[in-house]
Amino acid sequence: MLYVGIDNGLNGGIVIVNGETKTILSKFVMPVFKGKKTDYDIKSICKILEFLNPDDVRIVLEKAHVRPISGKRASFMTGFGYGVIQGILEAKSLSYSIVSPKDWQQEILKGMNTGDTKKDSIMFCSRRYPKEDWRATERSKKLHDGLTDACCMALYCEKIFN
């Protein structure tokens, strides 16, 4: 069984974990077009998900939350990305569950008390998978919390479906 975590933000990620070997099969920074404004690369998202077999995969999609301090475009893009990914999953007949950030964070990150869930997910994934490179690209200096959040969601997915 494969377990997939999807952080659907523009700076999110998609991580696929093999349930038998407990290893990371693939990880992808959320595909986007960058220009004056960042937009989702819907074709690339479809390509990432196209090889998944509906009978052998469980997916967790993070519920979109709009922050009160977000601007109009940020709020729109949050909902847009959430809807686009739900549409792709439905069109491909892939089984998925929607989870709130609080649910997966409380389960996977319990015992980590930095007060910053992004740092906690980076620390958790770096410890759990020390050989994985959590940067968005080889040139990146910072670790990508969208990837680590997606990994945590994939591990949460395994817990709720077992």
Model-derived features: where do they sit?
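Phosphate- and other anionic-substrate recognition elements at nucleic-acid/protein interfaces
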Residues: 1-162
